[in-house]
Amino acid sequence: MNLFSTSVAVSIIILVLPIVASFTNIFNSPNYPHYVKTSVSYAFTISLIPTLIFIATSQEMMVSNWHWMTIHTLKLTTSFKLDYFSMLFTPIALFVTWSIMEFSMWYMHSDPKINQFFKYLLMFLITMLILVTANNMFQLFIGWEGVGIMSFLLIGWWHGRTDANTAALQAILYNRIGDIGFIMALAWFAINLNTWELQQIFILDNNITILPLMGLILAATGKSAQFGLHPWLPSAMEGPTPVSALLHSSTMVVAGVFLLIRFYPLLENNKTAQTLILCLGAITTLFTALCALTQNDIKKIVAFSTSSQLGLMMVTIGINQPHLAFLHICTHAFFKAMLFLCSGSIIHSLNDEQDIRKMGGLYKTMPFTASALTIGSLALTGMPFLTGFYSKDLIIESANTSNTNAWALIITLIATSLTAVYSTRIIFFALLGQPRYPALIVINENNPLLINSIKRLALGSIFAGFLISNLITPNNVPQMTMPLYMKMTALFVTIMGFTIAMELNQLSLSLKMTTQSPYFNFSNMLGFFPMTIHRILPYLNLSASQNMATLLLDMTWTEKAIPKNISDIQIFASTSVSSQKGLIKLYFLSFLISLLLVLFILT
């Protein structure tokens, strides 16, 4: 082992130490969160060593030391793939998690189980790193399921609330659907290729059938909340804000996109799979951008922006630019984590108020948070020379110049424009204007835990894109020439979005809507998707099963089939054999009438 692999091992050991310490008395110490946060910061510093070595040498490494098991001829080893993707993603994930943990020490300080919370956050990070560095599908599946179960525990952290429990259950159920696809792909590779090692899969068969790729796409759809399996993502906002920040920036939701990036050697030879990914991503990015326009919960707006960016990453994979999608994952982590931390800062300061209509004027009372939120929103829209610009602009350029579906490109451009609209809406509602919150609320953002964490991410949101795009050489040939109007398309649609938002803001001061528009209802009710999937379909299933149980089974089997049939047979037999009908009441009545007639005649 050399310095490259040794420093990676040291980073992992440092991260595991607080987990081991949780089985001792240290876990009961009030300083445990500080230990966890410090461990992550040390792990980040050490993880820079292999990353810098990789940047200097561009030498990938695969570490495979421990033979796990052999099932017939299928050999499983614990192997780590230290390549372009894992070496670049690991320090970014550690840096973002370090900032989120420092923020959590301020945000969750009054929580009685804060030590357990930090332990869960750390386990969440470790499972994501297992997923990123895995060199075989089984190891990747362990990390995949790990982030799933940790997200369930963290989204449902405030388990006394019904909404939190429902959201956690929703997240795990939607991910179960995706996991079916992953398991089907595992089974196909085991049966047909007899291996789960990534290198062997890529070498053995490049012209692979669509079936395992469909399984992988289904898995990515569930984990990365693409259209159809997306409702769990906004619901996941019921968890604490640090959980939302970690979930949306560098863990969980990017795992699905990362899976497809890992398998790009198979996808690039299958145009059907690429077209499917492109269309799925384009629909997702537009639909979620439309939903974000009318939301009033600040965290849900940021959550829908995540889903929209995930759709953009899927579009990038669909046009066969996996390295560009990965670059967007890396740049997106910084400003998305910062947007959530700024939202958490505002929510905490306003006594857990999340409605942007009840905010306003925060640039006066919370200047630091307001500045960071503005930087994050501008980076999200792809403002030139902020972090988001370096990946988003390239994605739009690549989509413009690729032989792709024109509708997918138009949809992506509209969604990019809408990103600017809802980002500006947050700034207008939350930061500008007059305060709309109670005057008695005391606002104080002068806490080093809060300021330092947001400050680091703000610096990342400004400089990280420039550093990443300049340090890492592209693995494919970029477009050398391009007309000016195509080059400026991304900037043009973003500025158009800002202009629309400004105009809408001016109009909203004077316009009074008498009735709600159906388009507004469609956007505000999330396309009626949750209502249909979570209310109408379960109700129809329940009523159908109830009718089947009561009407079909009970009435047919326990009433008509046996008792009624037996009685009908007995009656038919008795009437056939006997001349008497057995009508006792009629006999008594005729006897009474004849008796009365006789008495009447005699008297």
From Swiss-Prot:
Enzyme class, broadest EC rank: translocase
Q: Name one GO biological process term.
A: mitochondrial electron transport, NADH to ubiquinone
| InterPro entries found in the cross-reference section | NADH_DH_su5_C, NADHpl_OxRdtase_5_subgr, ND/Mrp_TM, NU5C-like, Proton_antipo_N
Per the record, the similarity remark reads: Belongs to the complex I subunit 5 family.
What catalytic reaction does the record list? a ubiquinone + NADH + 5 H(+)(in) = a ubiquinol + NAD(+) + 4 H(+)(out)
Record GO terms (molecular function):
NADH dehydrogenase (ubiquinone) activity
Predominant cellular place of this UniProt entry's protein: mitochondrion
Q: Assembly state and interactors?
A: Core subunit of respiratory chain NADH dehydrogenase (Complex I) which is composed of 45 different subunits.
Please give the PANTHER family that the UniProt record associates with this protein: NADH-UBIQUINONE OXIDOREDUCTASE CHAIN 5
Q: Transmembrane ranges?
A: 3-23, 38-58, 87-107, 114-134, 138-158, 171-191, 201-221, 241-261, 273-293, 301-320, 325-347, 366-386, 409-429, 457-477, 482-502, 582-602
What is the name of this protein?
Answer: NADH-ubiquinone oxidoreductase chain 5
Q: Please give the function described in this protein's UniProt entry.
A: Core subunit of the mitochondrial membrane respiratory chain NADH dehydrogenase (Complex I) which catalyzes electron transfer from NADH through the respiratory chain, using ubiquinone as an electron acceptor. Essential for the catalytic activity and assembly of complex I.
Membrane topology per the entry is: Multi-pass membrane protein
* Gene this protein is translated from: MT-ND5
- EC number of the protein: 7.1.1.2
Localisation per UniProt entry = Mitochondrion inner membrane
GO cellular component terms, A-Z: mitochondrial inner membrane; respiratory chain complex I
Q: What keywords would UniProt list here? A: Electron transport, Membrane, Mitochondrion, Mitochondrion inner membrane, NAD, Respiratory chain, Translocase, Transmembrane, Transmembrane helix, Transport, Ubiquinone
